[in-house]
Swiss-Prot record:
DNA-binding segment(s): 204-279
Organism of origin: Danio rerio (Zebrafish)
Gene Ontology CC, one term: nucleus
Family: Belongs to the RFX family.
Tree of life domain: Eukaryota
Coiled-coil parts of chain: none
Compartments where located: Nucleus; Cytoplasm
Compositional bias (Basic and acidic residues): 706-722
Record note on quaternary structure: Homodimer. Heterodimer; heterodimerizes with other rfx proteins.
Name this polypeptide is given: DNA-binding protein RFX2
Length: 734
């Protein structure tokens, strides 16, 4: 672009042209003192079209020859005013950020330019600088490749869009750079960071923007994010900041980020809430590296038994470009989805140590030595670690192949594949024994009980990996994958152990059944939690629920339930008042969970350290369910408007109470929750103990003193009341 030769102290005019055709532009001059330029260009394909002219206040006709404009860049048009020098391309800031999608554009400061495309086009443009009064609007009408721009106020709404193949302006890069500048400026003001460190901060912040994004209802472990950052600094040979400073960097980029402590009791960790890894981030494949092995607290030199995902051709190149698609085939799409889901599971979990084998006074079977026993222990440990690896990588279908390999099954797997180990060494580590010797060892009672205990530990670890927090939002695709996995477990095990004795299969199947049932229950609980979360966040629904609950006749409920539950009336009244108060405070789901946890602690505290703790816990569940059903019954009879909300809340609270009680019982007995829930899975082997528990329960319910008092009352009370109190013999037998 060149200056006008006639430029002087008098007001001058400058005209711009964006057409590439040879037709001379129609120039409407404007005084430069008004700081406005009106450009009208007509392409060769639009010769017959009418030119739309926009009224511009205070425009004067100044006869002056204007030289033809020279283009410095095919994608930008710049202008100069008066005696100003020509701006070199690339030194001005964009006034408008562009996106090929429909986008609302905000006006920025600085010199303005508009993208022009090759080919025929009609453009009518008025560019206004800051000198224009507030009532002087800037109007733009374009017809480029079918796009239409509507001017309203200072915002420009584009319908349609330019051809993607011809447009090269990146909105994301400009918005990212703006975010970086803003974040660095905030850090310099708040933390007093020197200006010479801005380039270092820029690399750290850019890495955060490239790999993370905001997402509602999602959390990420704080330690995992910092480990990712340390790895990045190590690869780029940068000096990392400490964890506290890194937290400030994150909050400077992702405004409003919250911190929560999530996880099960005794294993909770701090999480950033509202941020997640981008699906195309290379950090999703960290489990393939030694850093991932170190995060799992295993030796770096330990070999990986089963590779979670095979490296795809050209993936190394695609990792460096966020614009490229990560997966192009169905197999790669599944792999990418699994990697994305791993942020919702606990990938830092390790397999706890197994208990020692107690042979007692049982002699070893013939042809079995202690060397064989120790070899079985080692092989089974390797087998369980391999199981944990494939579940942690969400490769559920490999469980079937693992079982077939260990139990020497010759049956084909459900997907037609036959092998999974990576080498012959892996086969030897997993199998370890011929089938005949393996059957003999599994029939040996101490070995059978030891493997049962190992299975309880393994499957409890798998539950804590897949569902670390039952109340945390989880994608429905991951939940469905876990439920399908649970549905297939028993069939896979039965197929893999076809040639084994039934007593061995039943022992293994009982634990697997408890594991599958736990996965189904926890995923259902998680689904209920997400549905109830929306109800508890709705103020109008909460007010309606409180109004309906105040109409319930709790005195009548207590009178009907007291005969069955025999609960202390003061305890029931306290729970009623606490429930109403918590509902009135419009508590969140996490606050309700804390309230339920406190209720369980208060009720079961008198039984701590007692042998009757498991029975007291089960009785509490029955009584809680009975009372809640009585309240729901009253709401139903009254046609309460909030009945649906109460029904959903009741289902969630009953299920969460079940979850809390089973963990309390496991803690009191020193067992895993899987072992507690699998206690009655194999009824045939536990019938004697069941009879003993029934006898003790009957003795507790009808002690000698109770029976004597009951007989005394029966002599003095009317016959009608005796019918309500006396327990029939058939009921006592049951």
């Amino acid at each position: 672009m060149q200056r006008s030769e006639g430029g002087s102290e008098t007001p001058s005019t400058v005209a711009l042209r964006t057409s590439t055709s040879a037709q001379a532009p129609v120039v409407q001059p404007v005084p430069a003192s008004q700081q406005r330029v009106l450009v009208q260009a007509t392409g060769s394909s639009q010769k017959g079209a009418q030119v739309q002219q926009l009224p511009v206040p205070r425009v004067q006709q100044v006869p002056q020859q204007v030289q033809q404009v020279q283009h410095y860049h095919s994608q930008q048009v710049q202008y100069v005013e008066g005696a100003e020098a020509v701006y070199p391309n690339g030194t001005i800031r964009a006034a408008y950020s562009y996106n090929p999608e429909s986008q609302l554009y905000g006006q920025g400061s600085g010199s303005a330019y508009f993208d022009s495309q090759a080919g025929g086009a009609q453009v009518t443009t008025v560019v206004s600088s800051g000198g224009v009064p507030t009532h002087g609007m800037v109007g733009i009408a374009m017809d480029v490749g079918g796009s239409q721009i509507i001017s309203s106020g200072s915002a420009y709404l584009i319908h349609g869009g330019m051809e993607g193949g011809r447009h090269h302006t990146s909105h994301s890069s400009r918005s990212s750079s703006a975010m970086l500048e803003m974040a660095i400026e905030n850090l310099q003001k708040s933390e007093g960071i020197a200006t010479h460190k801005s380039s270092l901060l820029n690399s750290h912040l850019q890495w955060l923007l490239d790999n993370y994004e905001t997402a509602e209802g999602v959390s990420l472990p704080r330690s995992s994010l910092y480990n990712h950052y340390l790895r990045h600094c190590q690869e780029q040979k940068l000096d990392p900041v400490n964890a506290a400073s890194f937290g400030k960097l994150i909050r400077s980029v992702f405004m409003g980020l919250r911190t929560r402590r999530l996880g099960t009791r005794g294993n909770s960790k701090y999480h950033y809430y509202g941020i997640r890894l981008k699906p195309d981030s290379p950090l999703n494949r960290m489990q393939e590296d030694t850093q991932y092995m170190a995060m799992r607290q295993t030796p770096v030199h330990q070999k990986q038994r089963f590779k979670p995902f095979h490296k795809m051709d050209g993936m190394g190149d695609s990792l460096n470009s966020g614009s490229q698609h990560l997966s192009s085939t169905p197999e790669q799409s599944v792999a990418a989805q699994c990697q994305h889901h791993q942020q919702y599971i606990d990938v830092s979990h390790v397999l706890p140590p197994f208990p020692s084998l107690d042979l007692g006074s049982c002699p070893l079977p013939e042809s079995i030595s202690m060397t064989d026993v120790k070899k079985l222990q080692s092989s089974y440990r390797i087998h369980c670690e391999a199981t944990l690896d494939v579940v942690m990588n969400l490769q559920f279908h490999l469980i079937e192949k693992l079982w077939q390999t260990f139990w020497h099954s010759t049956a084909p797997s459900s997907d037609g594949a036959t092998t999974i180990p990576n080498s012959e060494e892996d086969v030897e580590d997993i199998r370890g024994f011929p089938r005949d010797k393996l059957i003999t060892l599994c029939k040996y009672e101490p070995i059978k009980q030891w493997m049962r205990s190992c299975d309880h530990i393994l499957y409890q670890a798998l539950v804590e990996i897949l569902i670390p927090d039952v109340l945390r939002p989880v994608p429905s695709t991951l939940t469905q994958a876990i439920r399908n996995f649970a549905k297939s477990l028993e069939g896979w095990l039965t197929s893999a152990m076809t040639n084994f004795p039934p007593e061995i299969i039943s022992t293994k199947a009982a634990v697997v059944s408890a594991f599958a049932q736990t996965l189904r229950r926890y995923t259902s609980l998680n689904h209920l939690a997400q549905a109830a979360r929306a109800v508890l966040q709705n103020t109008s629904q909460i007010n309606q629920m409180l109004s309906d609950l105040n109409r319930v006749d709790f005195a009548n409920v207590q009178e009907q339930a007291s005969w069955v539950c025999q609960c202390d009336e003061s305890v029931v009244q306290r729970l009623e008042l606490d429930f109403k108060a918590t509902l009135q405070q419009q508590s969140s789901l996490d606050q309700w969970a804390a309230w339920l946890d406190n209720v369980v602690n208060q009720v079961l505290k008198p039984y701590d350290g007692s042998l009757s703790f498991p029975r007291a816990a089960r009785q509490f569940l029955l009584k809680w369910s009975f009372y809640s059903s009585m309240v729901i019954r009253d709401l139903t009879l009254r046609s309460a408007a909030s009945f649906g909300s109460f029904h959903l809340i009741r289902l969630l609270y009953d299920e969460y109470m079940f979850y809390l009680v089973e963990h309390r019982v496991a803690q009191a007995t020193g067992e895993t929750p899987i072992a507690v829930m699998g206690e009655f899975s194999d009824l045939s082997s536990l019938m004697p103990s069941l009879k003993e528990q029934d006898t003790s329960f009957s003795d507790d319910m009808t002690s000698d003193g109770d029976m004597s008092r009951m007989s005394e009352r029966s002599l003095t009370e009317p016959a009608v009341k005796r019918e309500r109190i006396e327990i029939p013999h058939s009921l006592q037998e049951i």
